Structures are given as C-alpha cells and as structure tokens.
Amino acid sequence: MTYVTYLHKPSSIRNAVFCKFVNASSWNVIVAKVNCLEVYSYENNRLCLITSANIFAKIVNVKAFKPVSSPTDHIIVATDSFRYFTLFWDANDNTVSNGIKIQDCSERSLRESQSGPLLLVDPFQRVICLHVYQGLLTIIPIFKSKKRFMTSHNNPSLHDNFSVRIQELNVVDIAMLYNSSRPSLAVLYKDSKSIVHLSTYKINVREQEIDEDDVVCHDIEEGKLIPSENGGVFVFGEMYVYYISKDIQVSKLLLTYPITAFSPSISNDPETGLDSSIYIVADESGMLYKFKALFTDETVSMELEKLGESSIASCLIALPDNHLFVGSHFNNSVLLQLPSITKNNHKLEILQNFVNIAPISDFIIDDDQTGSSIITCSGAYKDGTLRIIRNSINIENVALIEMEGIKDFFSVSFRANYDNYIFLSLICETRAIIVSPEGVFSANHDLSCEESTIFVSTIYGNSQILQITTKEIRLFDGKKLHSWISPMSITCGSSFADNVCVAVAGGLILFFEGITEVGRYQCDTEVSSLCFTEENVVYVGLWSADIIMLTYCQDGISLTHSLKLTDIPRSIVYSQKYGDDGGTLYVSTNNGYVLMFNFQNGQVIEHSLRRNQLGVAPIILKHFDSKEKNAIFALGEKPQLMYYESDKLVITPLSCTEMLNISSYVNPSLGVNMLYCTNSYISLAKMSEIRSLNVQTVSVKGFPRRICSNSLFYFVLCMQLEESIGTQEQRLLSFLRVYEKNTLSEIAHHKFNEYEMVESIILMNDDKRVVVGTGFNFPDQDAPDSGRLMVFEMTSDNNIEMQAEHKVQGSVNTLVLYKHLIVAGINASVCIFEYEHGTMHVRNSIRTPTYTIDISVNQDEIIAADLMKSITVLQFIDDQLIEVARDYHPLWATSVEILSERKYFVTEADGNAVILLRDNVSPQLSDRKKLRWYKKFYLGELINKTRHCTFIEPQDKSLVTPQLLCATVDGSLMIVGDAGMSNTPLLLQLQDNIRKVIPSFGGLSHKEWKEYRGENETSPSDLIDGSLIESILGLREPILNEIVNGGHEGTKLDISVQDLKSIIENLEKLHP
Amino acid sequence: MNMDIGKALSDVGGLRDITSRANNSLPPTPDSSPAAPSKKHKLYDFLESRGKIETPRKRIVFEKKPLLHKPVHIQKKPAQLCKELLIRQLGGSRSHPFSTKTSRHVGGRLNLETYYSRPSECLMMLNQLPFCLGFANNESLLAVCTETGALELFDSRFYDRQNEENQPSARRIHGWLAHNNAIFSVNFSKDDSLLATSSGDQTSKVFDLSTQQCITRLGRRGVDGYHSHSVKQVNFCNDSPYNLVSCSRDGSIIFWDMRTHGITIDGEHFQKPVLRIRKAHENSGRDCSITSATWLPQSTSQVISSCSANSALKLWDLRTVHTVRPLPAATTPELTTSKRDFGVTNVCTSPDGERIYAASRDSIIYEYSSRHLNSGFCKTYKDPRLRISSFYVKLACSPDGATLACGGGVQDKTSGVVVFDTTRNCSSSAMLTGGHTKDVTAVDWSSEGQLASISDDGSVRVWNSSLHGSAANLREKNFSEIFYWGFSEK
C-alpha cells in the first residue's frame, strides 16, 4: 500500500486574516497554507505560533467575522469543493473548535467563476458573501440574536445560506461596501465585449433578495476593489486608481503594476481597530505602497507613497506599531517594520522570516560525505532562489556581540561551574572577558595583552589559568600573573593536567610543568600543530608532512611513533573514546582533507585511516564537549560537526554557514553551549543535539526552472521576465548559470536567444557535459514549433562553452538519459538522440498523443507523460521506438516516474496521483496494450517533479520503504513509500481508527479528502496518509488508548499504546 | 498589463482576448454618435445617478469634460501553451495566484471562431462521393469511405519536412476497396487496432488496421436472421473492442460480440448476431429505417438509436432487453414543437455520456440527458444556416464535450459545417465556410480537437483551431488571398 508523508510541509501562503481570535484583547494572525491553518499571536513585535490545524480540504479563502454575542472573532473557511465551515477559539479547552460544520454550496450545473472563488465579509458584520459560480452569489447572514447564542452551547454563528442571482457573469472582483443601512456590494465585471464595468447591489436579508443599486460606472479598468469607509469604492486598475461613489467619480494615474494585495492599516489603539483611511498596497513587482485618500466635499485626492520592496505578496496584513506581515507564494513570507517618519528610518526592516520554498519547479538530491541535501529551484518572477535543504544541526543564536577581526577565542571555567572567562584573540591583541553568573560581561585587564592568544586552560586542579600567547606562557591565580617569556615566538601550544607543551619558531618543542621548563625536543622542520593528550603524549604535526608522537616522562622525551602523510597537517585534535583506551586522532591537511587514525594503547590500529574531503581550504578542527557526543567541529568553507553514532562516523553540516571559528562554551544560565564568530560578530548560541531540516537560500538572478549537477557544479536553467510598461510587452530571457558547489557562487553563464525558453537539462554520462533543451516561443505562435538541443561543457578556465547545437521541430520539454542515448520529449513526439563526435544524431522518434510533459526511463522502458492523455509506454528495440502500451484515460499529467517493475507513478494537474500497471502477460492483446489503473489517490497539490530517490536512508526495521520524492507548486516535498504487505493491514486499520476517533475540523472527512477526484467521479483512495498517523503522537494517553481499542466503532488493534508510539516513531524516521 | 499571461489563463485560456478582437467587427457607429469611440483617448462619463432616472442602466452619456481617464486599450496577446505551462508550474500568476482549476485552463480553448482550414488541408476525391468519415481515437488518422466502397486513410497532421511553413497538412496514407457497395459508416475501435465499416451490401466488415485484412463480417446477404437492407451504421463499444452494434434500413438493430463463434464459409468468416431487435422503431405499424445506433460511452450495455420516421430516440439496455419481445429501457416523448414528425438523421453522445445530441430533419439539434430520456429534450441548438436536408448529414461532439459540429450548413450558396458551443446556456454558433462548395454531410472530431468534414463536391477538409493568427486574420483579408481557405464565421 502506498504511504505518503511530508518531508517538507507546504509553505506557500495565499491567505491570511487578522482578527481577535484567541481573546478579545490581543490580535492574532491566522495564516492559510494549502490545507493547514496556523494561528499566530502578535507579541513583542513577533508572530508566535500558537497552534496549527490540519484541515482535510484545500483552503481557498479564510475570513474573520464577529457574531454579535461572541466576545472573540470567528473565522469562516472556504474550501476548494465549494464548501465552507466556521471555527472559533474555545477558551475553556484552549483549542480551536468547530462552529458551523461543513456546508455544501456546490451546484454542478453551474460554471465556475473565472476570477476564482471570492469570500467577503460585510464591514458591519451582517452577512458573508461567497461568489463561486458565474451569476450566483451565496449569502450567509451572520447571527444577530444574543439570546439564542447564550442559551445553547452549540451556538450557531451563521444562519443558513441562500443564493441570489446577479446579472454579471464575468466577475473580476467584488467588494462589500460600507453601507450602514443595508449590506451592499460592488461588482466589477466584464461584459461580452471585454469592457469593464462596475455595478452595485443591495442585499435584502429578510426577503432573501438582491436589489440593484444606483451607483454604476462604465468602461473602467480591470483590477481590484477596495471599499472605502466613506461608502464608495476604490478600483485599483492596471494603471489608474478610480474612486466611485454615489456623489464622486474620479480617477488618477498612480500605478505602474497591477496590485496583488492590500490591507487597511491598523491604528495603535486596539479598541478602534482598523484605520481605513490609509491602506497598504502591494503590487506585482513586490513593491509596497501606502495609499492615502483625502476626502473633501466634492472630490477625493489620492496619494500613493512608495515604502520599499519585499516579496511578491499574496496577502498583506498591517499590524500595530507600523508592522506589516507579507504572506507570499513566491518567496519567504516576512514580518516587516515599515518606515515611519517619526522614527526617521526609511528602510524596510525584516523582523521575522517565514521560510517558503514554493513554488518548486525542479529539484535534485546531492549526496556527499555529510549526507544528502536537496537543491530546489524555488520562487518565481523576481523572487527566484535555489534552496539547499539539509538535514543539519541547528544553531540558534542567543546573543550577538558585534565585533570584527576576531581570529580565535577560548573559554575557560575558573573556580566556577560554568565558563566564566572568555579570551578573544585578535591579530595582535587579546581581550579577556569575565562573565558573571547573571550573564553580565566585564573586561579583565590583567589577562588582556598585546599579543594574540594560542591556548588557554586551567592547571593545578583549576586553581590557575594557563594562557599561552605568541610571546609568553602566563599563569594567573586570580590576583597575580606569573609568566615565562619565550626567546622566540611561540607557534603552538597545548597542555594536559599540569604539563604544558609549546612549539617555538625553529621547530623546537619545549615542555613545562607550570612555567618551569622540564625538557625540549628539536624537530627537523617547523611545527604546524600540536596536541597534548593524556599520559604525557604529544602529537605534533610538522611542515614536512609528518606527524610524530612524543612521550614525555621523568627520563626525558622520546619519539615513540611517527606517521608519514602525503599532505601537510594543519590542525590536530585527539578525541578519546569514553571508557576505552583508544581514541581517534583527527588531522586536517592543507588541501581540505580530514584524516582519522584510530589509536589503541598508543599504537595506530592498522588500516584504520579514513580520509574525508570536507573542502578545499585548510580546515580548523576543534573539540566540542557535549554530554552525549564526543564531537569535533570542522571549519572550512562549510562548518561541519563530526561525531560517532553507534560506531558510524556522521558528518553533519551546521545551519549557520558564515562561521570563522567556533568553540564550545558552557553557560547554563544563558542556555548556551557554544560560541562562534563570523566576520562581523560573535554569537553565544545554542546548538541542538538532534538534526533537523534546514534551508539555505542562494538567490538567483531571474528564477530557476531546471537544475542538474555534476561533482563540482550546479547547472541551473534560469528565466527572467523583463516587463516594459509603455508597450505592455513582456520579454522572456533565458540563461544557463553555473554555480560552484562549495562556494555557491555563480562562476559562468550562457545567455540564450530572444524568445527562447529553456525547458530541460541533463548531465551526460561523462559527468562533464550537459545537454540543454529549449523551445522558441514566438509571440504569434500558439505552440512552439522550433527549439534547440545544445551540449555545453565547462572549460578549464571556468567558462561555459557550447560544443554542439541541433535544431529540432518543437520545444524540448524534457530530457532523460537512456543508457548512452538522450531521450527528448519534443512537442508531440519522443525522439532518441545520440551524441557522437561533437554532433547530435537522431536515432529514432515516435508520435505521442498531444504534448510530452515528462519522461522517465528504466532498463528497457521509456515512459512518456502527456499534457492531456496520461502516459504511453515505449520501448527502444533494434533501433526502433515502438509503443508497447498506453493509458486511454484522459489525465493531465504533470510528472511521471517508474515506481517498480511495470508500475508507473503519474501525477495529475488537479493534485491526483495514479499508479498504473502494465499487464504484459495477459492472454488478450488488447489488455496487454492497455495500461490498468492500479491505484489512485489525491495528494492535494500540483506536483511539478517526481524523482526516484530517498533523502534519508531507511533503516532495517523501517515499516515503510521510501521510493519517490515529489516537489510541489505549494512548496512541499512529499515522500511516497511502500508500506509492504505485512505492515499494510495494521497501518490501514490504524488510519481508520484515527479517522473515527479524532474529530476533524469542520466535520470534514479525511477519507473523502484523500479520494481520487476525477472529472465526473470520485473513488476511494488507496493510500495511507503518514501526516495523519504522525499527528497523533502528541495526543494524550486516553485518546491513544481509544485509538488502540477502536473507539467510535473502530476495530480493536492488536497492539498496546506503547507499540503504537514506537510505530509512529519508526514512521517519523522517514523524515527529519 | 499585457505580460500577464495568467490573466488570460484564468479566462479559459485566453478566451477574453479573442472576444475582444472579434468584437471589433461590431457595426461601426457614426462619428456623431455619442457612443463613438475616440481614436486615441477615450473620454468617458457617467450617467447622472442621483435620484431615480428612467434611462436604461448601461448607457454611456457623452460629455466634453473628462472625469475619468483610461489608458489606450492595447490588444492583449494570446496566451501561449509554453507560458501557460510555466505559469501552471509556478502556481499561478502574481495577480491571480488563485485559480482552483488551473489544469483545465491550460490549452482550454472555447471559441468558435478559431477554426480554419488551409488549402493543404483539403483533399479531393476524384469521381466518387465521400459518404462517411471517422477519426481514430488516439491518432490523427482519418478514414473516409465513398459511395463505391473505397476506404481511404489520411493523416490529418502530416508534417512535411520540405514544407517551409512547417505546418501540418493532410496526406493520404493508404486505401483499399472495403466493400463493393456504398459505405455508410466507418468506426475505429477505442484502441485504434480495428476498423468497422457498414455498407449497402447489407453487411458490415471489421478490419485489422495493421494488416488491412477483413477479420470478420457482420451479416450475410440474403440470409435470414441478419440485416436485410443497407446497414446504416456500425459502432464499436467504448470499453470493449469485441462488442459492436449495427443498424439497418430494414428497421433492425443487431448486437455483435466477436468473442462468440462465427461460421467460416469459403475462407470468409461471418459473425453471428448476439441479439437482433427487429422493428426497433415501429411507426404506426410500418417499419422505418434505423438511422443511428450508438453506444453510450462508459457503458458496455446501453445503446441509443434513432429512426427516419420520427423524432423518438430509444435507449436499449442489454441487461434488461428481452430477446423475444425486446422493449427499450427508455424512449423520448413525442415532440410537440413541430406540426409533423421529422426523422433523426444522426445521434451522437458527449464524451462523458451525460448528453445525447440528435440532428433532426427540422434542422434543429436536440439535446437530451441520457439518464432522463423520458423527460424530453433539455436544450435545442438552432442556427438559420443549418439545413439538415438529407439523411447523410451527421453531427459529432468534440472530445472535450464543449463543441458540437454538424454538417449541412448553407449560406449564400456556400456550404459548411455549423459548430455550436454546448457549455453555455445561450447557444452560440459559428459556421465554417469557404471550404466546401456543395452540401457538407458528415463531420468528425479527432482526439486532438481537429475537425474533419466531407462534402458532396468530393472534398475532405481538416479544420484546425487556433486562437489567433490564421483564423482571425483570414476574415479581414480579401477574397483572392483566401481562395481555397476555410475559416469560421459568426
């Protein structure tokens, strides 16, 4: 049975409301993400997540309203199947509760409105208006009577809806006007000649009628309506802004781009609420404006003031204190501080970032020693980014100190149970800082000096601080400072217990007890690094690419061991295994490798050497003291953490990428366990012990469409939209951009021709060349009729060079590698090319139904997904492409991937997914040629790309084997797996019990939500929804008990609650 | 903003753009008229809206003083497939981030004035009249049969490498003599592996398309128990390539199943009927010709039939029909609209099987709901140009169910196909003119939305739909430039 769960939940925000949801005294922001509602509270200039609610339907719109008797606002949620329900905050239970359960207003016989569903609330809280179908308005009166509300607990907040007819079919936008006498509407619509008009209506709730009002306006522009408090309505057209009311009709040229979202600003006084004389408006270019309208007796003056640039907004919410929440589909959603005149700042300041990786056009999985990372092509229009998603250790900054030029730092715990001394080593200065138990920092002038510090620790049983600088060894007992001044400059130093060891220029190693010299050893070359471990053993790295092991005892110093390396060691750390004689010596070399030698009783275990390349520049190794892990920081181009987890070396990246140096620092009162510095600041931070999904953003000029990678580079196909207002023309520019993997910087690019759209890219077998497919999209053509296949290679001087070019008759929508051949989907055909001696040859081609969208291959099959007509199975036999089987159902495929032998996974544009089966042993030919629908279900989001890969390697005892990874338009990454024959019955029954026991929001059925939705039919889904099963883990014990025992007519499961928990924990291991 | 392809997307794939273009052909208003459009800047005003006024609501009153400004209307470019796909991939455009039915809008074209046919898409049959045609269900393969029994196969989307315009043309692929008598209908099986023809020789034949060999015959001439007159139509069942239905002028409908045993005589294989319904449409005691018998899609048991004597349609359900005294599962009531009975020339179904369209001799197309035949027609399609004068006129519903095409259009001595929009409540229609000189009889749709028509002048034409370019420009050109072209006209 198919098991589907999220690796990354959808993050695109299309709707948000601002209301007093939780209590009447504070504001909440409620955000809708595909099928999830998130309730945020607005406190201390931040939005804090209070709770999230999974809705078993796609949320189309959310609005807040206030029933007269209720102290708080309720919200109404409109879903994609033309239904609505209400939710409110139950103050007793502190949860979101159902108000009105699901109400169906679907009318199969009517045509859907072309502008999409609209949900509107009367500003005077009398009715809610829903426009879904052409020419039909559904009016939902809000409950008025206080009495009935108080008496029954199951209080209705809304009356039953009724429908009224309007004459306008092609509605552009609707607004509810500020009309105190009767609820009224303004409708912006297009007539049959595409001319835009505005008409108004009044709703008669009692008679369930609608009457035409007398405010009309003809021949204006298409745009958005914003109701004004003065009773009129603003029309934000494509360039002009109009104000239309009974008395005044004016227009003014204000805009350069159509607006996408608006929000009335909020006055600081929570009692008064909205201030609708000022609006915040966002346009398509991501620009934010403040819109002011000044009313006089006869006219209105309108003013638009530019505030700054942000993500392209799909919803805006103005918050008190000049804050603004921008919800976006195309980029991160942000909480902004708007510029204010009083505070004299003119910049938009981002206060909070809500990561959004939607829309994902394409993705790849990149594996290296540090584990897998997913690179997604995210964003669109001006907001294109590459996102690198890693399962990494998260570092949370607790405090930042701005300071530049720091080379290294040390912390030491001197007569305290926390690290109370911090030494900051600059290029020619050391600053010592004492941290008080309360976390107050003060400078210590005794320990600060004019040299940089190399090493700090405590000796003599934590009674003295040992500080090794480039000139001297200093001992500090809290009051007095003793020092030994070196004749030559000290290059490295280390200590263990009371013994100190330093290396000075010239390759001389000196041993001390305290500051009394006890021995010396002359090396052949300069010392590059040194590490003093227990039993008086010193590991010394030399510039001659050797590591020697010196043992110090009463008799003198002897060389006990030496290792010859190929590269020069730069940093050495010895890490002991707990409760064992052995340990591991980590050596970083000057070319970015980290070598690991395992030691046992002072001897290297043979063949224990491991080499890991973590970068190209020398890596700084540092010990990290943690309760559970004996971990080593490795700081190169990317900061990483190495540790052993059940005898397996794990190298994990850290979420912060700009680190220069790092050190463990223990201070429980501050809740930090590490200290790191970047170019500009030092941070006291908390490093989490467990790995989680972290997203790194690389901004891209234009927006990325396709990506592939070899061992060194990312090849990204990007597009740029250049718009000129004057001619109202749009230019599409396409680029191939090459990013270096380590630095993530663009090193080369190739620009394609005008009108050429980049469609596909693959890496060839030799790991060097890439093939790019394009299509010419001339403005006077409906479908592309020409395109190019191009072969590129990186030259040695980091330039991208075109090696071959082949013209084809259509757009190359998709490319895959099949053995050594290139399979291309070109318009309505599949072609096989061979690249030989710098030219492309056509080997064969075959027609496909309408338009090839995606191709997937395995050993002997080529599966082509079609724009409208499902998939076709092809085979390439004896230089001939032949059609083996086909699915005759209409299916608007978006991606295809082979699931297993003769099973194909196809995703569809409406969010369905189908698994098709090829029956190649059926006795009847017609059955062999026909693909069978094996399983079908609803995923809820349009999937752009499916790949056969796993992000986290499944463990042996895993209940579900992950198979595919799907990236969606709404920014989610889904794992499609197989639950296996033996686990399926249990998981299915568990899912069934959860459906029965856990009440759903709005009374929606999870079963219906996952049903396949065809044009005319819905059918039960063959799917186990992982996110549903995982959602119960946090629930209370009695509920889990009920699930196990099959409450509400469920089936009793043969497991205990403890088993249930371990099952879910097992399932959760599929994703971080 | 013009760059907004997504807007067009949300307008059913750019429907609006075309309507705005098409409406430029409105009758011109005199310059003195208040509603005259200014060339550069339009000046607009509002009617006085204070108090109750008797003037009609949507009239524009002209006044010198401009109050509202509006930028010059620039024609919007049509949405293109590639861009639509791009927008779909990005989850909508910026202004319309929400369109619930994103998928259906891609490539969804619903404008009747977009059809055109180039000279290269016209083929002439020499010395014989084409009688019927049929498109393959998955390919751009067109079969045309003639009065002499010849069967010709065409590729309606043939890409010629030498062709500079790089546009598809129609090309003959193959042909053979299927019958020694006129062929009245031709039909492909759902997977296009088989082809069935019905002929005036009282039999039907089933051909294997890959070998063009007749694998079986449905009916034996002069033998009792089979059709005893011309077979008017033969149809494959949608869900099974083995089930067929045929109907004849003798008033009988016969169901065939190719999995049953037949008999082989002189090396020729004959199928035996599974069920024969005699006198299927009895009209006041007399037999009448069954003009059409077609399966309901998504059903292996239900067949709709029509006759030449009256407007009644009958639904036969194999699950309930009695072998001795067969009775239909449902019958349409008598029409009360017309004074006398008109026969039905052809019946077709919408792809989802919900609607049945019947072309009646009174030049009206009646739409029935297949589930409620008894309650009568639910809609009619009329056009003054539509003349269903002969029983050779056929109609066809497009694969997306949105357009209905019918032969028999006549306008000022030219003939053509009449197309109707079935999705709207008010019926809108257009005629594809210029392509044929004599009566257009049969039409059919390909799976890719191409339309083919045949005419008594011997021509076979393939019509393409394009949002812009060809079809729109053609109407504005003069006669000599568009000679031998066909295009749609409102």
From Swiss-Prot, chain A:
Record's subcellular location: Nucleus
Example GO molecular function: DNA binding
Keyword Iron: no
GO BP terms: DNA repair; double-strand break repair via homologous recombination; nuclear mRNA surveillance of meiosis-specific transcripts; proteasome-mediated ubiquitin-dependent protein catabolic process; protein ubiquitination; transcription-coupled nucleotide-excision repair
InterPro entries linked to this entry: Beta-prop_RSE1/DDB1/CPSF1_1st (IPR018846), Cleavage/polyA-sp_fac_asu_C (IPR004871), Quinoprotein_ADH-like_sf (IPR011047), RSE1/DDB1/CFT1/CPSF1 (IPR050358), WD40/YVTN_repeat-like_dom_sf (IPR015943)
Subunit structure: Interacts with csn1, csn2, cdt2, ckn1, iqw1 and wdr21.
Name the record gives this protein: DNA damage-binding protein 1
Organism field: Schizosaccharomyces pombe (strain 972 / ATCC 24843)
UniProtKB/Swiss-Prot annotation, chain B:
Keyword Repeat: yes
Gene3D superfamilies for the chain: YVTN repeat-like/Quinoprotein amine dehydrogenase (2.130.10.10)
WD repeat locations: 178-208, 226-257, 285-317, 339-369, 387-419, 435-464
Disulfide bridge partners, by residue number: none
Record key words, sorted: Cell cycle, Cell division, Meiosis, Mitosis, Nucleus, Repeat, Ubl conjugation pathway, WD repeat
PROSITE patterns with a match to the protein in the record: WD_REPEATS_1 (PS00678), WD_REPEATS_2 (PS50082), WD_REPEATS_REGION (PS50294)
InterPro entries with a match to the protein in the record: G-protein_beta_WD-40_rep, WD-repeat_CDT2_adapter, WD40/YVTN_repeat-like_dom_sf, WD40_repeat_CS, WD40_repeat_dom_sf, WD40_rpt
Subunit structure and binding partners: Component of the DCX(DTL) E3 ubiquitin ligase complex, at least composed of cul4, ddb1, cdt2 and pip1.
The protein's name: Cell division cycle protein cdt2
